[in-house]
Amino acid sequence: MALVAGSAAYQVLRGVTGTFPTQSATLLARAPALCAHTMNRRRMSSSQQTDHLERTANTFRQEIISPAKVCGITNESATVKRVRLAIANREFTFKAGQWVDFFIPGVPKVGGFSICSSPGLLETEGVLELAVKYNLHPPAHWIHSQCALGSEVAIRVGGEFCFDPQPSDLPLDLVLIAGGVGINPLFSILLHVADLHKTREITGRGFQMGNVKLYYCAKNTGELLFKRNILDLVNSFPGKVTCSFHVTQQSSPICRELQPFITEGRITEKDLASYVSTDQLCYICGPPPMIESMCKQLQSLHLPKERILFEKWW
């Protein structure tokens, strides 16, 4: 999951200087889309990489730690479980793109999982969702082996990678680029974009959202999380929400529904060139090598680095 952010963002300069641990930085002006922080180039040891609290020690967190109860569990893919949590504290809020500290009774390690639902779902139904890939790290392993309906946990919101435009902000087009489970915070952003469009259509007020395109790469179509939800958004907002799915190790036939949206192979500069322009804001989440490659390609297309926001995960 996405656990540490490093970025430069629209109207904010905090630097994109490296790869892993965070350092403090200075906010120069408010961005309609963000929170970002500077990172240095020192690589972390394998033991450090497994400690979410260490990695994010200098990252913004809310003060509220809310009890939460598991009220839904589904298999999003063969390796990813989607968990719905009912949030007890009514003052608990988050911004699209943020993550949670995940506290499990009896499990000493604290998990760090990106939220994959929209802030609007929390406001209307009092729930949020996480999508957690299987691994042996204790919090993720607990979700896959012991988590059940009614399980009680506690969560706290953190993260400086978010999309939170205000009604007075200028219209904005987005590019979202995801690799693997890096889709989680970007799916939250995409759902929030849909909510902004709905609010504008119904009330004529609120932030005037521009267009958004999602580029999403995974090993195969089975590992493209939320793909049907994403296609529903594409169909609900024609021209305003578009997507391009990429698969790198597809061995089975691609179903007819997905075929128009699938490209076999990684996301390339040529793929990006068909949509990217210099006035857009780009969010990227995925493995560090992918992010480094995407940043270079976007800058080759003359997208200013201050408009590229990213979050790296392991």
From Swiss-Prot:
Q: Does the keyword Transcription regulation apply?
A: no
Q: Which domain of life is it from?
A: Eukaryota
Signal sequence region: 1-18
- Enzyme Commission number(s) from the entry: 1.-.-.-
Residue ranges occupied by any FAD-binding FR-type domain in the UniProt entry: 63-166
The reply on keyword Signal is: yes
MF-aspect GO terms: oxidoreductase activity
Cite a single Pfam family from the UniProt record.
NAD_binding_1
Kindly list the positions annotated as binding NAD(+).
180-185
Q: What Gene3D superfamilies does the database record attribute to this sequence?
A: Nucleotide-binding domain of ferredoxin-NADP reductase (FNR) module (3.40.50.80), Translation factors (2.40.30.10)
User: GO CC annotations?
Assistant: mitochondrion
Keywords, in A-Z order: NAD, Oxidoreductase, Signal
- Write the protein's name: Oxidoreductase NAD-binding domain-containing protein 1
What is the originating organism of this protein?
Xenopus laevis
